[in-house]
Amino acid sequence: MIKITKENIIPYLKEHLPDFDDSLPVNISMVGEGTEEEDGDGYVNYIYRVQTPKESLVLKQGTDISRVSQQEIATYRNRLEYNSMRIFYAITPEYVPYLKFQDRENNVFVMEDVSDLKVVRFQLNKNKMFPELGRQCGEFMAKTEFCTSEYYLSREKYRGLQKHFENTELRRIMEDQMFLDCFGCDVDYSLGNNFADFASQFSKDSRYRTELYKLRRKFMSHADGLIHADLHTSNILASRDEMKVIDMEFAFMGPFGYDLGYLVGNLISQYCAACFKRFPSEQNRKQFKAYLLATIKSLIETYMKTFTLCWERSVKERYRGQQGLLQSILQEVMVDMPGYASMVNWFRSVSDIPYPDFDVIENKDDKRNATVLSLMIDWGIMFGRYKYQSADDLIETIIGIEEEFRKSL
């Protein structure tokens, strides 16, 4: 296997892209060598940005050793990421980078560079707003999940996706890390012993553990449609009008509602941070918090609406007129989604893994308060989800817990 470097990347591209023009100045940079805010990727794979006056490309190579941690990792992930992007682009070309070519022998693919857009997580950390983010992400999830489900595809194509995207090794990371490791992870003591004791007490609660096991069972056994499976705000790039989703190597046939909950959880963490981090004024804080809640509402409602439209227009003949089945699917999403949101925030909040959403808060007491609020919301939505009928019910829980928490300060 050829290992791509800054020294050999130009002849490599010329070999695989005959129209690649290096007669003009070419700028080559490795993604991950810059700041997180600039790149948001490059921890596992070797990713290069190649810019000429005519075009800008990104080359991604998956080796058997992770770039940063130097741990062994399956190289097939590069092939699965390319194929998932190809499928998602066919369904929602407006939300996925355009692919140029794939080199399976060397675990490489090349796509358009979308770095003119910004990594959403770090823009939210700076209180930047993306008015269309909820709608765009809701459309992306609903369309791609429906169009890769058995409700749309032939049985043969659906089974083919299940087999192709088995993704055993990377799925194991999520199955263990997100659903199990929070019970044995090193609690973050940097926020004080009282916080560590509080977080540990929550983590040891058998009721919460039972809920995580129930969600893990669905994550492992429900092959509803092709999901991204790592759709956090660092894997979304956006401007005021555009949005692109990247980094799809965890993709597999998983449950409806997982990606939705994963992203909602990231937005909840931003909300908790916004309750305590610095703003130019309290009016700015109020506006940003309102924006985050509106984005959560738009995300969920757009998903439900778009999935329904896809169903009404394109569901297979045998399911036409079965509104009860559609409503059952959407209700299950409404119940599962807050659980997955709780799960992802819980793990990131109690562990000592850096969490940029909270790390941006400079004052230690404010950071601790934001993290505690997040844990309390995680607890509340995990057990409150069974009665939720709409996004408004979830948002009501978030606001209610914040109000009660402030009374204790």
Give, region by region, the residue ranges found by the protein language model.
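Short, flexible/disordered intra-domain loops and linkers
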Residues: 66-76, 275-289, 361-367
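Conserved ATP-binding subdomain of kinase catalytic cores across diverse folds
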Residues: 53-56, 61-168
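Conserved NTP-binding catalytic cores of kinases and kinase-like/nucleotidyltransferase enzymes
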Residues: 1-107, 240, 394-409
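ATP-dependent phospho-/nucleotidyl transfer catalytic cores
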Residues: 121-140, 150-228
